[in-house]
Swiss-Prot record:
Organism, scientific name: Californiconus californicus (California cone)
Signal peptide range in chain numbering: 1-22
Tissue expr: Expressed by the venom duct.
Family recorded in the similarity comment: Belongs to the conotoxin O1 superfamily.
The protein's name in its UniProt record: Conotoxin Cal6.22
Disulfide links within the chain: 35-44, 37-48, 43-55
High-level lineage: Eukaryota, Metazoa, Spiralia, Lophotrochozoa, Mollusca
InterPro entries documented for this protein: Conotoxin
Length: 56
């Protein structure tokens, strides 16, 4: 029973780490697009948009 609990906890921790890593990859991709668009622009649907305009 103890071993089963340890295995379940280990799987949950690994899953959480994978989700966090995926989120960080998305954040890095967004920041790269931000830099490619310029300081006052953001990437919206792969189009550079002025930072104060809504996403088209």
């Amino acid at each position: 029973m103890k071993l089963t609990c340890v295995l379940i906890v280990a799987v949950l921790i690994l899953t959480a780490c994978q989700v966090i890593a995926a989120d960080e990859a998305d954040a890095n991709r967004l920041s790269t697009r931000w830099c490619a668009c310029g300081v006052n622009y953001y990437c919206c649907n792969e189009v550079c948009t002025w930072r104060e305009d809504p996403c088209p």
